[in-house]
């Protein structure tokens, strides 16, 4: 087991996609930004407390910039609190068969209780594509512009490795480099995971 770092945000997005699919929210719905969210360390969009961000921009901020402030905004708006949202994330993980995964926050910022495995992350990568194919396409977004600033995707395989169509990178000092990658060639799809490479 290791710290999933920003691969955590795949599950955060899974719950956003669930809410979109069940029509609880739409892409144009607005999430309110709390003071607590603005205090999250980078990587971030530097949102202002009291402002709003649309669901679509929140998704793109996680996919490209891996913004920690936005992950907290999502958690607080969908789960009432980040702690409660993390419980929902863990519950969903168990439901998907991710038996060795526990979430404590929505961003992947260091927390000793937030742990997963390469196998569980592969399970999540497969599940999010299978259960949310329409939204999964957003993981191949190469860049997005928010308030005049362009943010590019941290996944360097996009555009450089043929057939890559997602999904997410992660890094903290404690976890090392993490990656869940999705590649399709000649009708064959592979979901690969690199977990904790220093």
Where are these regions (language model features)?
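Active-site-adjacent loops and short helices of periplasmic peptidoglycan-processing enzymes
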Residues: 1-119, 128-130
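Domain-terminus/edge residues, biased toward the C-terminal soluble/receptor-binding domains
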Residues: 98-102, 110-198
């Amino acid at each position: 087991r290791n710290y999933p770092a920003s691969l955590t945000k795949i599950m955060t997005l899974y719950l956003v996609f669930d809410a979109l699919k069940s029509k609880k929210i739409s892409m144009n719905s607005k999430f309110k930004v709390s003071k607590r969210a603005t205090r999250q360390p980078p990587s971030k969009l530097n949102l202002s407390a009291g402002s709003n961000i649309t669901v679509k921009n929140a998704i793109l901020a996680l996919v490209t910039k891996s913004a920690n402030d936005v992950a907290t905004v999502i958690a607080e708006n969908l789960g009432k609190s980040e702690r409660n949202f993390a419980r929902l994330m863990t519950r969903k993980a168990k439901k998907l068969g991710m038996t060795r995964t526990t979430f404590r926050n929505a961003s992947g910022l260091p927390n000793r209780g937030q742990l997963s495995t390469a196998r569980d992350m592969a399970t999540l990568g497969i599940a999010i594509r299978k259960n949310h194919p329409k939204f999964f396409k957003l993981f191949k977004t190469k860049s997005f512009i928010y308030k005049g600033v362009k943010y590019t995707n941290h996944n360097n395989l996009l555009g450089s490795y043929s057939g890559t169509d997602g999904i997410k990178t992660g890094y903290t000092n404690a976890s090392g480099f993490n990656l869940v990658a999705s590649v399709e060639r000649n009708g064959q799809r592979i979901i690969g995971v690199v977990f904790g490479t220093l």
